[in-house]
Each structure stands twice: as structure tokens, then as C-alpha cells.
Amino acid sequence: MSAKGVSEKEHSPMMRQYLDVKDRYPDYLLLFRVGDFYETFFDDAREVAAALNIVLTRRSNEIPMAGFPHHASEGYIAKLVKKGYKVAVCDQVEDPAVAKGIVRREITDIITPGVTYSDSILDDRHNNYLCAIVFLRVGRQTVCGAAFIDVTTGEFRIAGLLPEDASVFLRSLHPAELLVSAADRERSETLRHALPAGTAFTVLDEWLFREEQAGEILARQFRTHSLKGFGIHDNPAGQVAAGVILHYLEETRQSSLQYITRITPLQSGDYMTLDLQTKRNLEIISSMQDGSINGSLLQVIDRTRNPMGARLLRQWLQRPLLRAADITMRLDAVDELKKMKPFRESVCCDLGQISDLERALARIATLRAIPREVRQLGSALAVIPLLKQSFQDTVSKRLCSIADALMPLPDLVAMIESAVDPEAGASMRDGGYIRKGYHQELDDLRQTASTAKERLLEIQQEERERTAIGSLKVQFNRVFGYYIEISKANRDKVPPYYEKKQTLVNAERFTIPALKEYEEKILNAEERSLVLEQQLFQALCCRIAGHAEVIQENAALIAEIDCLAAYAVCADEYGYCKPLIAEHTGLRILNGRHPVLERILPADEPYIANDALFDDRQKMLMITGPNMAGKSSYLRQTGLIVLLAQAGCFVPAEQAEIGVVDRIFTRVGASDNLASGESTFLVEMNEAADILNNATAKSLLLLDEIGRGTSTYDGLAIAWSMCEYIHRQIGARTLFATHYHELAELEGLLPGVVNYNASVLESGDRVIFLRKIVRGASDNSYGIEVARMSGMPSAVITRAKAILAGMEKRDIATPSSSGLSLQSMQISLFDEIDTRLRTAIEVIDIDRMTPLDALVELKKLQGLVRTGNII
């Protein structure tokens, strides 16, 4: 049942109030506070009940209803938002006891996947991006721009895109929520299908996507008349996207945005683009096995000490640098930290004491922080002078720059320390979090309440003596205030001037004029104290937010120090070397190792290191050899070493010289994309086409088993043709692993193609995979041996060996390579059958055949193909 299914006259006043609010927030799940519960109604109730697995009930007029206790709301809301829902919270904003008529309710918070500050929803080591993509008509062409923000850190970026690259950008960014225009339905649907699982998709009105609207809101946010100083003036579509984001934040009641102090262009020339396939195939951030961090490059490299560094490290690994000078500057800083172990350990200790400045600032600026968070921010800021002093004596260019750029805020630290009690807890309800001596009026109110409470103890003693009731007590609760409690056993001793307030099973409660007088003094002082304390705390938060730009700059520098130190720890503990970075298109890795596999091997099993050499004479390494011999690991290893080097990290190798790579493309493994109706082979061909269309001479191509998803002939032809195209048209450094041994012929036909193989050691009827990549081609795939190792029944293995021996004896399914050339590949299989088939077809008299005769003849030909005999 929807809200429209019931006449408005049938609704209660509260339900009419609910419907009025729901009309203003139709796209949100509305959580409506009713007493101690948040309730949902109509279709919202069905959604909530299903999403949270809670009971769906009904009100008196059959209205569906589902709810949960308000004290447990954070966990329930987190579950809803993680499932992609947008939630509006409608609270009671007046005391039901004093309300005249229906209790007044208002929207107090809006939470969406891209706009949340909740620790129950966020991962402190992962950014939470809200993104907008805009397609804008400029003259005769359509331009595309994107903007994305993490409201929990204040990071706000803008990017210019080619329209056809928007989907790739989204898959790479992996935002929590995407904003698009209702006017561009076709492109919006394309983007929806490109979104990673779990990303919320929000369609907004067309009028929000106007340049004038965006310009006004950006100028207002950054208090400027021109955006030229931000370097984004030449990206109109990106500006519109940024304006849409800011409007959406205002719409979702994010009114305190002063901590968002800058917007930064994401320059494509600064960073390497890693598409989703490359991230997945190289397992940079998550493993292919279960999607978790376990088994990924990030798990090995992340030795950061605080959340800011952890988030930045994820960005570094997903955005390797493209300029040799920038890479070398980062490597030099890592080198210095690696060599200075005692200094590095001291720095890491300091980093461990620094809380998440970025997210704390966002919560403080939006008045969502609790006193303990403010105190932690002050403690973190107090470490900055120590870090600045520590780095004064460093020599590498980047570390010196960091030392100069760190900006201590001693006055702000002193203010926080003087204002917030170090014992402040998580709750603000009972006050007491502002320190004594910070504000005179607050101290006076507290003193008044304290003095009055002391007088209550005196009243208690006086009444005990006056009534001779030794158990008489003066107590307090939130419902009845202060009262005198007397047990039933002493009921006959109660004086007549005692005014009864409440009767219990075993006691009665009273008040007297003196108690009323001091109760009023205490409650009045405490109420005023709580209000004043809250005002002082909010004022302190606003003062802190006024330093947002400096705090964010310090946070960025601390995160960078954390990442550099983490790199240095990896280099020191894992035995990594400092790569030499150059602008040429060569690549020289000596005794390289896979950074993840070497960490998970048993301690007594050494990792087999391998070289990777590219120069003018070696542009394409054709790698043959059996499955399980290490070909795929070798490809991934090479890609990860290049990626680490350009991310500014030392690499797992004895020596490495990296000619800067502009893109790393991978085609390693494939599976069906059932959602898009794509087969394994089509997925493979789509990925291969993307590589051929976008790779350059400065790219690194990692191609594994191209063509295996189709017939032998088709697959070999495609693989051969791709090799030729890469050699002639692209000239990229290429590792080409294949089970088509015929491709080894290319070494003699295409200059720069060089054969390598994954070596094995044969011992009787067994083989040992050595995991060593050596010069030369392989002539055996050892497929039966791999099948034996997998645990296949011995009868199957024995029969397979017999079949293979027979096929090799008759030269069946073994292509001849002598006819392969650049002009044609004339591979002849089943020569005898082909000849007989051709003869049988030639003698058929088609003109005299009836349809039935044709079917009979076709059956005979089919028998020849299947069995080698005419049926």
C-alpha cells in the first residue's frame, strides 16, 4: 500500500504530519520519531522490513509499518545506507508533555551513501566519494566533466573527461554515490550500468546542471569572483559537476561547509590511469578471490600508522606518477627514511599518536563532534611542532619541503586544552565537558548548583533529626525532581506539612517548601549551565573550523610522511631496492619478485626470482610453457614492480631501471559477464580491443593466453594478428604469455620479438615446474601432468596419455609451422580427412538431389568429419 491508497480524511493528525514531510522527501526512506521508536510507513516500511529483516506490522487502518528503537538507530541506519538507501531522519523537536496538539517534528538529519559522517558506515582507511558527472554541449561538440568530494575529509576534485571515458573513470574512482541529470537519460543509464556494485545512483532535476547556477554556488562557497586561481576555469562541465555536488550537500542539510576550502583539478598528465581490469588483474587494492584486502598489494605495502596515511596510500597505488622528476623526489625521501632507522621509528611513534585530523575536522565543522574528538584533535595538533623539528635536519628535497610547510597552531592547541576537559566522555547530555576556569559565568552557575546540593544534604540531616526517621533520604529523578523518600514502616512519623508526590509499594515520596526552593535553584542553574556549555562548545568548534585550511594542509603533509615512512619500512624489512627512473622506453628488472606471493610462501621455500629486460632489441617477450609453471605470476610481478616504482616505492628486485610507463594494460584471465550478456570470449575480446585502441609506445602490455576462449584456429589467428599489430602499430613493451607454441615462429619474423619459456625439469614420467623464466621457446605444455597434479583419477590420466601418443604418431592436432608467414598462416590439420571430404563434396550432383537425398548425404559427410569414415 502506498500513501496514495488511503484518503487523507482517514488519516490521524500524526499520519497527516508524516505524509506532509514525506511529500518533501519522496526519494528518501523517512524515519519518523514516535516516542522511543523510529517508524516507517507504507512502501518505506516494506523496504525497511526487507532490508533490515525486521517485522512488518500494520496500523489500525491497514497501513504497513516497521520500526526500531531510537537508541539503536545508528546501527540500523548504517545497514540501510550500506545497501544504497538514502535516509531522512524526522525527530520530535518539542517535549510531548508540553506540546499543544500534535508534537512538532522536523528533519534533523539526512544520510546518503555519499553524504555521511557516521563511523558505523565509514571505513577510516577508505575514502567515501560523492561524484557528479556532467555532459555539456559546447558549440558543436559535447564535453564531459566530473567532480568528486569526500565530505568526511574535505577533499574536493574536478576532472575533465572524454565522454567515452566516463564509465572507465567511474569504475576506477568507485564512488559511494553518483549524481546525474534527469535530462540525459541514455547516458545516465550507461553510467548506471558502469557503476560498481553498491554505488547509489541519484537523478537530479535538469535545472541544477546549468553553468550559471554552478558558477554562483562555487563563487559563494569559495568566496571568490573568479575560479581561475583554482585552475579549473577551462573545464566548464567539471565546474557544473562541482556546483551540482555543492547544491546536493545544501539540499541534504550539510549547512556548515566552511571546511571545504579548495577544489583541485585532477590533471591526467600527472598520474597514470589504471582501468578496472588492471586493478583487478594485478590485485592492487583487493584480491580476486574474495574481494577483500587479503592477498592484495595494498595489504603488503600498507604499513601506515594513521587513517590519513592509509587513505593516501590507496590513492598513491591507484594513481602512479608519470613524471620522472616527481617519482625520483619521492624515492629519495623514502631512501633517506630507510637509511635512518632510529629516526624513522621515532617519526612512526609520533604518527601513531595523531588521530584522524581530516575526519575530526569535518565532524567539528559540521557540529557533529563530541568533546572527546575535539580534545583528540588538539592532542594531534600538539605533535606537529615535534614533527617539524624532527625534519629540520633531513636532506632530501621532499622531506625538507615538508618540514618547511608544516604549520603549528599553538594558540589553537592551547585554547582546546583550556576549554575541553581531558576526561570528557562520549555523551554531552549531562554536561561537564568544558573545563573549570574557561568561562566565568559557567563556573558561577556550577558553583550555584553545587552550593545548593550541599544545602540539600543539610536539609536531609535536619529532617532526619526533626522526624526521628534515620532512613529518610533526599533523592532525585528526572520525572519528579528532588523529593524526600520515607519507607512505609515510618509512615506514621511523617509530619503534616510534608506534601505527598508519589506512592510506591514500600515507600512514599514527599516534598517540603525548603526542598522546593533549592530544587528550583539547582535545576535552574543546571539547565542554564547545560545550555551555556553547549553554546561554548559550538563556538569552540566554529573557532577550530576557522583554521580549516591550515589543519587540512597539515593533515595532508602528515599523511604524506606516513606513506613515505611506510614505504621505507617495506624497503627495509622486505629487502626492496631503489629503482632508477628514466624517460626512455626500456625496462630492466634483475631478480624481480612478486611482492605478494613472496610474503605468503612458507619460510623454508624461497621465491624464484626472474629478470625482465626490454630494450631496442627486446620489445615483446613471447613466453611459452606449461600451465602452473609461473607465466601469469611473472606477468603480474612485472606489472606490480613497475607500478610500485612509479608510485614512489622501492621494488622487490635486486636491481631495477624503469623507463616511465604511461599505462599498464592487462589481459589476464576472463570470466562471463552474465549481467551484460557477454561470454568469456567476448569479455576477453573487449579487453583486448581496449588495449589495442589505447596503448602507446610508452605503455606496458601484459597479455596472458589471448585467444583461448574460442577454437584453436580462431584463437591462434587472433593471437598472431595481435602480436603483429602491437609490433607494427604500437611498439609497446609487451609480455605475451601463450599456450600457442606456434607463436614462437614470430621471433624469426618480427624484430624485437624474443622467445622465453617457463622452464621445467623432467624426471622419468614426472615433471617439476622450476618457476624460472629462461631464454628460448617451449615445445610442450605438460597438460596431462597438470591434470595429474590436480587429482584426476589415474584411469583418466592413463587414457589421456594413450590418446596423446596416438595423436602425436599420426601428427593429428599438431600444426605445421613451416607454412607460417607474415602474408598468411596456412595451418593444415587432419590432412587426410580434409582431402577425402573435399573429394566427397566434389562428386555430389546437387542439381539431381531431392531434399531427402541432401540430408542423407549431409549425414555421411558428418560421419566422415566425426569418425574419419563415410557412414
Curated annotation (Swiss-Prot):
GO CC field: cytosol
Superkingdom of origin: Bacteria
One term of GO molecular function: ATP binding
InterPro entries according to UniProt: DNA_mismatch_repair_MutS, DNA_mismatch_repair_MutS-lik_N, DNA_mismatch_repair_MutS/MSH, DNA_mismatch_repair_MutS_C, DNA_mismatch_repair_MutS_clamp, DNA_mismatch_repair_MutS_core, DNA_mismatch_repair_MutS_N, DNA_mismatch_repair_MutS_sf
Keyword Cytoplasm: no
PROSITE patterns reported for this sequence: DNA_MISMATCH_REPAIR_2 (PS00486)
GO BP terms, alphabetized: mismatch repair
Residues given in the record as ATP binding sites: 625-632
Sorted UniProt keywords: ATP-binding, DNA damage, DNA repair, DNA-binding, Nucleotide-binding
SMART domains attached to this UniProt entry: MUTSac (SM00534), MUTSd (SM00533)
Pfam assignment, any one: MutS_I
Family classification: Belongs to the DNA mismatch repair MutS family.
Reported function: This protein is involved in the repair of mismatches in DNA. It is possible that it carries out the mismatch recognition step. This protein has a weak ATPase activity.
Database matches in HAMAP family: MutS (MF_00096)
Record's protein name: DNA mismatch repair protein MutS
Species this protein is from: Chlorobium limicola (strain DSM 245 / NBRC 103803 / 6330)
Gene name, Swiss-Prot/TrEMBL: mutS
